[in-house]
Amino acid sequence: MKIIGIESSCDETGVAVYDTALSGSAALRAHSVYSQVALHAEYGGVVPELASRDHVRKLLPLLRQTLAEAKLSVEELDGVAYTAGPGLVGALLVGAGVARALAWALEVPAIGVHHMEGHLLSPLLEDDPPEVPFVALLVSGGHTQLVAVDAIGDYRLLGETLDDAAGEAFDKVAKLMGLPYPGGPQLAALAERGIPGRFCFTRPMVDRPGLDFSFSGLKTQVLLAWRNSDQSDAIRVDVARGFEDAVVDTLAIKCERALDTVACQTLVVAGGVGANKCLRARLQAMCRQRGGRACFPRPALCTDNGAMIAFAGALRLQAGQQSDVAVRVTPRWDMAALPPLVSRSCRR
């Protein structure tokens, strides 16, 4: 099956073609992403109405571009997958509307995909994918969750953030230190030059049982340290390093605890913060020390993209699942409520 995937949940427009007749990374025939960062920069964050309108402008040209890169005509598609939630309702409706219309015109099945299931499965697009069962850390600007994956489509929430997501905390700390939007990646780049231990911040909630997270108190601690400093460039990089170390340590401690809880040695990390170099190195070292393995998607597939949607959709379409003809989206959607897969035969 040749499946086209459409992602439009927030401020990236993503389109990809996944071919189940191929294996490994070769199965991803093409993928394209258009980012709206420049559009939202002057507002310091995503403006939902502007995001929706930009998806309308960019989605069809991106579809044509991706099909051309895959060397396919639209008539050769066997199915359509699209992000149905969670996300911004207007942005989701743009992608869902285009996907449903395309599927109807081609007389092929369509499937609405859970955005976070797409992220969770994205490491399976690589040449040496992890095998189930595994523990997944989903870490992005909107989510920080630990999920036990007993089988593809069978998910148990182990813990989640009680307030700010890790990526959200990165962006907010960057903003309070005067970095332009989106500040998270710039903060991480500054942290690489900082001196370890110059600023030591709390590792929140690691001293109590459980697998939930909280980053709002850490954010306040960083704010106070920054306000009480001379706010020089040298201090900025050291504060950035102290903050990043605190977040990475917290995530690593909770991940190790989750692996122990479910008696598993494989950790999958996905979501935008999964591209962070410090986090990758820390989790890889932790898993190696345990005799286990940490698996990540390539950095280009950590942020929102159509490839993960095409792949997740292919799994469910091959299992015989599909969505009805109505254009429906679910801005808030519990991944544990997803139907299990009847078949696990989709080739990777």
Swiss-Prot record:
Output the lineage of the source organism. Bacteria, Pseudomonadati, Pseudomonadota, Gammaproteobacteria, Lysobacterales
Documented EC number(s):
2.3.1.234
Give the protein's function: Required for the formation of a threonylcarbamoyl group on adenosine at position 37 (t(6)A37) in tRNAs that read codons beginning with adenine. Is involved in the transfer of the threonylcarbamoyl moiety of threonylcarbamoyl-AMP (TC-AMP) to the N6 group of A37, together with TsaE and TsaB. TsaD likely plays a direct catalytic role in this reaction.
Entries under InterPro entries matching the protein: ATPase_NBD (IPR043129), Gcp-like_dom (IPR000905), KAE1/TsaD (IPR017861), TsaD (IPR022450)
Sites binding substrate sit at 138-142, 171, 184, 276
> Per UniProt, what is one GO molecular function of this protein?
N(6)-L-threonylcarbamoyladenine synthase activity
For this protein, what reaction is catalysed? L-threonylcarbamoyladenylate + adenosine(37) in tRNA = N(6)-L-threonylcarbamoyladenosine(37) in tRNA + AMP + H(+)
Query: Where does it mainly reside?
Result: cytoplasm
Q: Which family does the entry's similarity section mention?
A: Belongs to the KAE1 / TsaD family.
> Which NCBIfam families would you find in this protein's record?
gcp_kae1, T6A_TsaD_YgjD
- Residue span of the signal peptide, if any? none
Q: Output this protein's name.
A: tRNA N6-adenosine threonylcarbamoyltransferase
